[in-house]
Amino acid sequence: TISPTIAPTVSPQLVSARDRLRPQAAVTFSDRLLSAPLFLTRERRANQDVVATIKRQLQLLLPGVSIFLDVDDLESIDALESYVQASQAMLVLLGSSQYFTSRNCLRELAEAQRLSLPLVRVHDADAAKNGAPLPSLRTAASRRLQRQDTTRLFDVGAAQLPIIIPWLRIGHFQQGSLASIAEQVLLASPACVDVASVPLALKGGLAWAEPTFAQPVALFVSQLNPAATEPAHELASALAEVGVSASLDAATHWLLFVSPECFEGEQGQQLEAQVQAATAAGRRLVLAWSPEACDDFKHVIEATPHALVSAGLYETLAIEWRGGVHRRVSVRLAAKALGAQMMASSGGTCEGA
């Protein structure tokens, strides 16, 4: 298995997303990086489990890759900087704010900044796992780092800075995180010095599956639920068999985007009545929500009128509508909810279909 949280029906394999072949760069990368490892840095007491998992999964996905993790490889704390100097890149786990109060973590980071090592930035926001929001981490960093170092560690969108990769623990989403980490690790290797991108896929992974529909789908979006408009049109753009309907009667499904605020006020009351009527009429509702806007679905449930909860509105799981590298997973989860079969690109049914 790729992770304790992933149980695929076939052994996943990292392949080029362009041609579905094992990336040749990985072979050269592994051979040339053995003496220049990927250095993993994190707050040792709070975020050890995450980096241990990342190391284990990268070794499965990129056979032969050399990865330095102090609990496995450190011989002398006094020589910490020399280990950074011997590395090709550094993976920084942005999790606990205690990272920026640790003398040794700051030593590692300072040496990487001095050497201008490529940084693979991975963010764990899960507070239950000692994670924290990026703005809080940036504030903590700004107290201990120079402005340019804080900028390099947290800025996004600049051409020279790759994205900050969210670390998620749910299987299909974690696959997206791992593939993105592997892409950035490859791009930091000598083998890819002149390569702009190396899009990768996990063979059999949901994010790279091709949804197929037996019949066309028409999605209704209520004017009382404007948050559903953009996801509905994105689904219609991504999935050829899906369209958007202004009429509930003409639609096959209703996409309802729920949040703690969606049933508030007069408009929310009207939406509640509309949902009640649709539920009573046996309409097929597909629910979605944003974990990036609301960190716990229980807040959505608590804010939902009791009558809707009692009527079974949440008997079917709401789709996590995520952005960035995880959007492909959200789109395919929505496609499954709309009746699609997930076909692996190499043929056969995708895991989790």
Residue ranges of model-derived segments:
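C-terminal interaction surface of TIR/SEFIR-family domains
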Residues: T1-L60, G64-S66, H123-V242, A250, ...
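Beta-strand cores of modular interaction/reader domains in eukaryotic scaffold and signaling proteins
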Residues: F39-T41, S66-F68, M90-L93, P118-R121, ...
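TIR-domain catalytic/interaction hotspot
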Residues: A52-R56, P63-R114, A232-A280, R328
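Short beta-alpha junction loops
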Residues: D73, S96-Q98, L115-N130, I170, ...
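Long, compositionally biased, intrinsically disordered segments
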Residues: I77-L80, L106, L117-D124, L271-E272, ...
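Polar, glycosylation-prone regions of secreted, cell-surface, and some intracellular proteins
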Residues: L109, L255-L256, V275, L285, ...
